[in-house]
């Protein structure tokens, strides 16, 4: 028994050179139960001392517009007022959202009272006045952060801020200064959001976030006049980190913040203040022209104030203070740019989108070097490709005497047809999957009477009165006032009376609109200077409020002027209903500021009609282009004019949509917008009653616009993303449910666009990888108005669209995962879909609900059965948690429906009280995980389980058990395939397999929670014990937490066990002392020998001698942890000793040693404790390093033998040359020093290949990452196209070419779609070759002083996926094949490769063939070629022999067919693996 913990001793080394060409670290997120596409790009900042901003540029298909374009975000944590239940009132009734977006409530202290105190000090720093400090707790606890709201006791004393204590000991302050608050400019005490301003770590390191407020710079006079109160928005402008002087407390608590010279590193976000040309190095301070205004400015009003967004971030810049880092004179030092990420946009008046990001760095002479841009494109609304009208036969039965409406009556996310047959007789045709059409084809089911709806009478209407997302049938006739709700099954509920129907409900000017902002239909009467508001309270209305408007606001009144349309619509794209007035020559909008208040009117230019013919009844409002703003459709007799709303600022020029031949639109015609395609986008449906009723449809788009759908790295890889509406998945689900004779039940009443498929295409090899997702059981919580995700997700890792480089069938794996939605109506039915092919499998898990009880010093979870009310909140805490996962292989075999593995989880939800007695907080954890390894053998699985029996108050596991169930009893008949070798099944059984094994693990932790400390989960001690039982002792229904804590538990104190070991962590200050907040690990202690293992010495050494030897070897006797009765001590080893600096040294380690018997390795740091510059071992041997502080990477190393090692780094930190020199046998040896013989790495591969021997480096490298991009010059375009610069500037503006002339894949594609390409341009591009990204490394075999030096030249090509595509190494002269200019082999008259004797001879690696999953199938033999350039076609070879590797759906190699046709096979089973070589399989080969 030994469990050694070895400490990694810090060693100095130089970075290595060469290797594959990599991208910028971008990554696509895995599909999850929410169906969103996620993507992230790292920002160009260094790690500093190891504490750096945790930021990236991230995309989500569910995100809106912002400073980085549609869908993109880069924001630090924040706390905001909740707006989902209404516009904030800025009083004590407002709720707050945690950084994770959860509603927070005031927490309780250990005495059960509000955790509120008064304080005038923070982190030991006196504050200028007293604060009321209130601890808040999110409803859904994820990581046990501590959140405090600091409010001045006297409101006149200052402004409130927030403190967040992270479990890792970091302290964050939000909104301390005005620049980090989003607030009402006219009343700064009305704060909407508090933004992260500063972070301090336990080691005294700080990160400071600086924000810029919106202003009027570079805005037009019209923009300023319409939006004068524009300063609320905040933009992240700069992040400072790497403070020179440590400080335990937050800098913002001091009288003054440190000046900029006190920071070593800066990350700057540039919004157009600096030049964006790559040929001009951006300065730290920025230019004088100010930031740029975006064309798609937009505002949000959900906080009751206007938050105007006018800016786009154009670049992110990393700066270092190199003089300070190098310990040189810092007087007037200006930070130096070390990395740059440029952001290019497709600027659009409706929606601006990020289309490219590119890394740029600079040589010391200021010349730029670049990486290929990572490009993006989006599903777009193409005004030039709107299809024509087509008849709609689904409606042909309806005429003008049958009122009908396209409406989603059952809440399925796509509308059906509601119509009236005779007075009082209502029918509905729900949407169905169309049989025989394409996979998204929608039709309508058989008509279904709605018998339970009361007879339609005056005052009845369909509306969502309670805000649950479903329609209600509201009846407001005399004597009958109430509503029927519709259940997800389509059945109507019993009548619910309305107790507070306002008397003015029947007023002719009363309107229903969401003015409170809670998503409910409020009753409102509008006058010119006031609004009477009856707020909807989820089924009843509050008493009337008369809201007087501001002096400069006069509201339009409905019905006053027949020549104008007054309505509520989202003309501004903020997600709210605003008041709009449309006349023949103007559109005015009064922003909805919440609770009956409206802002000053905004005029949206661009819409006009002749005064004499304008008819408000011909105006229709709908979001046509998917931008979130309502567009205007005006119906003429012969056409529809569509005015696209440009981000709530203006309307575009109208698009004319001709009506079908012979159709004249008049007042008898009907026009409506509805999602009849089930794609989540609007189509136009027109009914023309004459001469005979005809119904038409026009699908304005086939895809939801503005979703990211293509990414191209310009290195050869393109990723395509495909979306599908949740309504389409529901129709699939509905079809299956109805086919099974069951009642379909939809719980997601609106469509969402979900990540359906992804394709990654390698443009170089033609390899195409695919992945597909299917979703079911969508869920919506109508009470909290939140999406809960999908209950089932099916993922396939390939499909029929995948393409390998060779025609080898590739079978997909299929993972079926079930997730909790927190809605019992869904979650309790999921188990019916689980695989049931193993009748001996244990029953599925059910959740456990507990309360935290302080019944002991440590506290414990006590199980309870929650009330129906509490169960709602505790179930909600499980949303998104994985319940079960089954892994299959869809290879078409009979075993395809038997899983390879099944994993299932059990969750525990701990209820934690808050001051809101109606809503508990909850923490969800996984307490049981059970895994079956079937390998498609249902009767003989391996089964294991992990159970967390007890966790402490902060969620750290204290007691857990790992269970390995015994193998099931041997059946009479083997369940394995008949082709297995004889006796294998019998011989696979072993008595150990029939044993039940349990391993108990006990743990303890340090939690530092006193005063201003908050550091959780520091490991303290751990012990493992093993239990072994006969097969019969395993419970028939399996283990659960309950069986393991029962009085007869198999891990009870009275059960025999085997001690398996222990470990303990000692922190600086001693084993039993509380560690400091810095948590400095002094050493680790591990048990090595116990009384059983010591039996090996019996008869060899007496106990006294043995103990003396053990003591002398450094072992110590220590008591067993978690000791049971009188257990003997164990021998332990202490390892991994460290000594640390003090506060002034940022608590950095100063020495390390493995044990006390070994010598120390001391560490010397640079002046600012960023990097180790010297190490000295126990023999006093010293290693020193000098650093390039652009990258915090060593470039020069003096080793223990005083030898010098030296590398040259390019501006991206890549090693491009290395050399070394020193002594050998007491004499100078090695390469010439850089001072004696400088060496400049050639700029191109051609120049490097021309180098002659005698170069003073051991290695040099040249990278060509942009070689897959064609390169144009302005001269080429001007000469071929007779261009005077106009075309070239247009190409630059359209991102067809980069500033340095590289042709962008997606920019070119967009240009071709909009403008096409002339023959001359196509010819020019065809003449420019594309070469896969590649690099050259030159390695010398001896020093430059030796005239026999040889240069080994090796070139590596990468494919689009970053895999090695081809390698070429220069060899001696001889025979080789020839490469033609079209990248194929030159052949002779017989069609075989032609041979030539050449001095330019290269050994080229053979081609690798891949299957549809990107797995290597064949690797062919290398060959000689007379050129190093990439050979794309070697089909002329006659020696294409290779083994063929075939994989199962999980990607495991199961068969190899050798080049001679023999086979090696491997078969996987739950308990053994069968390997057969060529001799074993020879008998099965066809002769």
UniProtKB/Swiss-Prot annotation:
It is found in: Secreted. One of its GO terms (cellular component) is extracellular region. SUPFAM superfamilies: Integrin alpha N-terminal domain (SSF69318). Toxin complex is secreted when grown at 25 degrees Celsius or less; at higher temperatures the proteins are present intracellularly but not secreted. Residues 27-378 are annotated as: SpvB-like domain. Disruption phenotype: Cells with a disrupted yenA1-yenA2-chi2-yenB-yenC1-yenC2 locus are no longer pathogenic in C.zealandica larvae. Its main location: secreted. Residues 389-698 are annotated as: 5-bladed beta-propeller domain. Keywords: Secreted, Virulence. PROSITE patterns: RCC1_2. Pfam families: SpvB (PF03534), TcdB_toxin_midC (PF12255), TcdB_toxin_midN (PF12256). InterPro entries: Integrin_alpha_N (IPR028994), Sal_SpvB (IPR003284), TcdB_toxin_mid/C (IPR022044), TcdB_toxin_mid/N (IPR022045). Coiled coil: none annotated. In the N-terminal section; belongs to the SpvB family. Semipurified toxin complex consists of at least YenA1-YenA2-YenB-YenC1-YenC2-Chi1-Chi2. YenB and the N-terminus of YenC2 form a large hollow shell of beta-strands. The shell is closed at both ends, within which the C-terminus of YenC2 is probably found. The Yen-TC:K9 subcomplex is about 26 nm tall and 22 nm in diameter with 5-fold symmetry and 5 copies of YenA1, YenA2, Chi1 and Chi2; the chitinase subunits may be solvent accessible on the exterior the complex. The Yen-TC:K9 subcomplex has no insecticidal activity. Residues 389-698 form a 5-bladed beta-propeller domain which closes one end of the shell; the other end of the shell is closed by the RHS repeat-associated core domain in YenC2. Part of an orally active toxin complex (TC) with strong insecticidal effects on larvae of the Coleoptera Costelytra zealandica, Acrossidius tasmania and Adoryphorus couloni and some Lepidoptera larvae. The TC has an endochitinase activity. This is Toxin subunit YenB. It comes from Yersinia entomophaga. The gene is yenB.
């Amino acid at each position: 028994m030994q469990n050694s913990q070895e400490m990694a001793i810090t060693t100095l080394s130089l970075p290595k050179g060469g290797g594959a060409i990599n991208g910028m670290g971008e990554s696509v997120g895995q599909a999850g139960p929410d169906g969103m596409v996620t993507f992230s790009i790292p920002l160009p900042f260094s790690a500093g001392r190891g504490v750096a901003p945790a930021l990236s540029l991230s995309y989500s298909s569910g995100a809106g517009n912002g400073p980085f374009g549609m869908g993109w975000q880069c924001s630090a944590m924040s706390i905001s007022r909740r707006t989902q239940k209404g516009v904030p009132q800025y009083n004590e009734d407002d709720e707050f959202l945690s950084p994770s977006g959860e509603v927070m409530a005031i927490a309780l202290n250990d005495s059960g009272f509000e955790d509120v105190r008064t304080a005038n000090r923070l982190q030991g720093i006196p504050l200028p006045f007293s604060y009321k400090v209130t601890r808040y707790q999110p409803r859904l606890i994820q990581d046990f952060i501590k959140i405090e709201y600091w409010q001045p006791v006297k409101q006149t004393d200052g402004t409130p801020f927030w403190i967040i204590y992270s479990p890792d000991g970091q302290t964050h302050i939000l909104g301390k200064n005005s620049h980090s608050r989003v607030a009402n400019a006219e009343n700064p005490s009305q704060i909407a959001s508090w933004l992260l301003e500063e972070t301090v770590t336990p080691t005294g390191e700080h990160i400071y976030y600086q924000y810029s407020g919106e202003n009027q710079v570079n805005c037009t006079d019209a923009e300023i006049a319409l939006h004068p109160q524009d300063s609320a928005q905040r933009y992240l402008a700069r992040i400072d980190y790497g403070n020179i002087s440590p400080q335990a407390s937050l800098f913002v608590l001091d009288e003054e913040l440190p000046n900029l010279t006190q920071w070593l590193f800066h990350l700057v976000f540039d919004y157009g203040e600096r030049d964006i040309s790559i040929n001009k190095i951006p300065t730290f301070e920025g230019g004088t022209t100010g930031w740029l205004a975006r064309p798609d400015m937009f505002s949000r009003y959900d906080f009751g104030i206007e938050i105007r967004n006018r800016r786009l971030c154009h670049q992110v810049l990393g700066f270092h203070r190199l003089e300070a880092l190098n310990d040189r004179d810092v007087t007037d030092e200006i930070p130096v740019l070390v990395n740059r990420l440029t952001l290019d946009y497709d600027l659009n008046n409706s929606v601006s989108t990020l289309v490219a990001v590119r890394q740029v760095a600079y040589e010391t002479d200021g010349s730029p070097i670049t990486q290929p841009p990572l490009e993006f494109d989006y599903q777009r609304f193409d005004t030039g490709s709107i299809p024509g009208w087509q008849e709609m036969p689904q409606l042909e039965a309806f005429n003008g005497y049958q009122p009908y409406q396209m409406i989603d009556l059952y809440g399925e996310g796509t509308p059906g047809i509601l119509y009236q047959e005779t007075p009082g007789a209502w029918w509905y045709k729900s949407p169905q999957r169309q049989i025989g059409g394409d996979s998204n084809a929608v039709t309508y089911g058989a008509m279904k009477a709605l018998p339970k709806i009361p007879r339609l009478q005056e005052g009845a209407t369909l509306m969502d009165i309670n805000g649950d997302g479903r329609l209600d049938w509201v009846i407001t006739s005399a004597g009958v006032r109430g509503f029927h709700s519709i259940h997800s099954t389509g059945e109507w509920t019993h009548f619910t009376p309305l107790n507070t129907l306002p008397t003015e409900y029947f007023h002719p000017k009363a309107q229903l609109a969401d003015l409170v902002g809670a998503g409910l239909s409020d009753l409102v009467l509008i006058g010119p200077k006031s609004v009477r508001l009856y707020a909807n309270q989820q089924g009843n209305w509050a008493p009337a409020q008369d809201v007087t408007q501001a002096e400069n606001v006069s509201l339009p009144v409905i019905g006053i002027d027949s020549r104008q349309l007054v309505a509520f619509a989202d003309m501004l794209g903020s997600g709210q209903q605003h008041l709009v007035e449309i006349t023949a020559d103007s559109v005015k909008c009064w922003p909805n500021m919440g609770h009956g208040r409206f802002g000053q009117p905004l005029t949206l230019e661009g819409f006009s009609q002749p005064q004499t013919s304008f008819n408000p009844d011909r105006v229709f409002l709908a979001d046509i282009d998917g931008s979130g703003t309502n567009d205007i459709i005006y119906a003429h007799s012969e056409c529809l004019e569509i005015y696209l709303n440009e981000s709530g600022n203006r309307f575009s020029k109208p698009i004319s949509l001709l009506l079908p031949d012979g159709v004249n639109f008049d007042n008898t015609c009907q026009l409506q917008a509805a999602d009849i395609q089930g794609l989540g986008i609007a189509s136009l449906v027109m009914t023309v009653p004459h001469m005979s009723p005809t119904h038409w449809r026009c699908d304005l788009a086939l895809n939801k616009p503005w979703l990211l759908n293509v990414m191209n790295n310009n290195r050869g890889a393109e990723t395509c993303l495909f979306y599908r509406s949740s309504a389409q998945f529901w129709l699939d689900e509905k079809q299956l449910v109805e086919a099974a004779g069951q009642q379909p039940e939809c719980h997601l009443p609106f469509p969402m666009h979900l990540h359906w498929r992804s394709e990654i295409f390698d443009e170089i090899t033609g390899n195409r990888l695919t992945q597909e997702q299917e979703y079911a059981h969508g869920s919506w919580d109508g009470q909290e108005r939140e999406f809960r995700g999908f209950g089932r997700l099916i993922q396939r890792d390939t499909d029929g669209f995948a393409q390998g480089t060779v025609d080898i069938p590739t079978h997909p794996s299929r993972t079926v995962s079930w997730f909790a939605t927190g809605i019992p109506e869904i979650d309790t039915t999921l188990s019916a879909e689980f695989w049931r092919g193993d009748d001996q499998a244990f029953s599925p898990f059910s959740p456990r609900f507990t309360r935290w009880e302080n019944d002991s010093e440590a506290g414990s979870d006590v199980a309870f059965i929650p009330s129906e009310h509490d169960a709602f909140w505790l179930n909600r805490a499980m949303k998104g948690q994985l319940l079960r996962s089954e892994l299959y292989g869809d290879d078409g075999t009979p075993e395809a429906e038997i899983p390879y593995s099944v994993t299932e989880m059990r969750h525990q939800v701990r209820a934690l009280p808050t001051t809101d007695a109606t809503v508990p907080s909850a923490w969800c954890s996984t307490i049981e995980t059970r895994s079956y390894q079937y390998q498609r053998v249902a009767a003989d699985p391996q089964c294991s389980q992990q159970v967390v029996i007890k966790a402490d108050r902060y969620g750290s596991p204290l007691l857990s058990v790992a269970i390995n169930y015994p193998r099931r009893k041997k059946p009479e008949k083997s369940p394995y395939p008949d082709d297995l070798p004889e006796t294998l099944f019998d011989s696979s059984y072993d008595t150990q397999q029939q044993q039940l094994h349990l391993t108990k693990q006990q743990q303890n932790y340090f939690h530092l929670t006193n005063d201003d400390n908050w550091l959780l989960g520091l490991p303290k001690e751990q012990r493992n014990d093993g239990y072994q039982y006969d097969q019969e002792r395993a419970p028939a229904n399996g283990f659960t937490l309950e069986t393991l804590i029962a009085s007869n538990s198999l891990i009870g104190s009275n059960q025999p066990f085997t001690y398996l070991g222990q470990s303990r962590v000692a922190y600086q200050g001693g084993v039993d002392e509380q560690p400091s907040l810095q948590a400095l690990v002094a050493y680790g202690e591990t048990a090595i020998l116990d009384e059983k293992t010591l039996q090996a010495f019996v008869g060899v050494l007496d106990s006294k001698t043995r103990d003396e030897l053990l003591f002398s070897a450094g072992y110590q006797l220590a008591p067993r942890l978690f000791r049971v009765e009188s257990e003997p001590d164990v021998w332990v080893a202490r390892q991994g000793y460290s000594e640390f600096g003090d506060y002034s040294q940022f608590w950095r380690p100063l020495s390390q040693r493995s044990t006390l018997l070994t010598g120390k390795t001391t560490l010397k740091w640079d002046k600012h404790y960023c990097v180790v510059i010297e190490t000295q071992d126990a023999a006093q041997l010293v290693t020193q390093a000098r650093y390039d502080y652009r990258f915090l990477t060593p470039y020069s190393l003096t080793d223990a033998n005083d030898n010098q090692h030296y590398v040259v780094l390019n501006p991206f930190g890549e090693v491009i040359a290395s050399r070394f020199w020193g002594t050998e046998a007491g004499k100078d040896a090695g390469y010439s020093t850089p001072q004696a013989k400088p060496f400049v790495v050639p700029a191109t591969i051609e120049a490097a290949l021309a180098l002659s021997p005698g170069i003073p480096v051991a290695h040099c490298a040249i990278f060509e990452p942009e070689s897959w991009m064609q390169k144009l010059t302005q001269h080429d375009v001007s000469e071929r196209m007779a261009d005077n610069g106009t075309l070239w500037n247009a190409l630059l503006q359209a991102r067809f070419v980069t500033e340095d002339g590289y042709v962008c894949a997606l920019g070119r594609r967009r240009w071709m779609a909009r403008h096409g390409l002339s023959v001359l341009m196509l010819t020019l591009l065809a003449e420019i070759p594309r070469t896969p990204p590649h690099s050259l490394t030159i390695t010398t075999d001896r020093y430059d002083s030796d005239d026999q030096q040889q240069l080994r030249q090796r070139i590596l090509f990468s494919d689009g996926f970053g895999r090695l595509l081809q390698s070429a190494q220069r060899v001696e002269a001889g025979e080789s094949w020839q490469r033609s200019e079209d990248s194929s082999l030159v052949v002779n008259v017989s069609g075989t490769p032609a041979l030539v004797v050449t001095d330019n001879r290269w050994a080229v690696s053979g081609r690798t063939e891949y299957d549809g999953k990107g797995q290597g199938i064949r690797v062919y033999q290398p060959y000689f070629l007379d050129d190093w350039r990439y050979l794309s076609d070697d089909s002329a070879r006659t020696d294409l022999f290779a083994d063929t590797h075939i994989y199962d759906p999980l990607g495991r190699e199961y068969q190899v067919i050798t080049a001679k046709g023999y086979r090696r096979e491997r078969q996987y089973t739950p308990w053994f693996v069968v390997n057969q070589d060529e001799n074993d399989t020879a008998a099965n080969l066809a002769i």
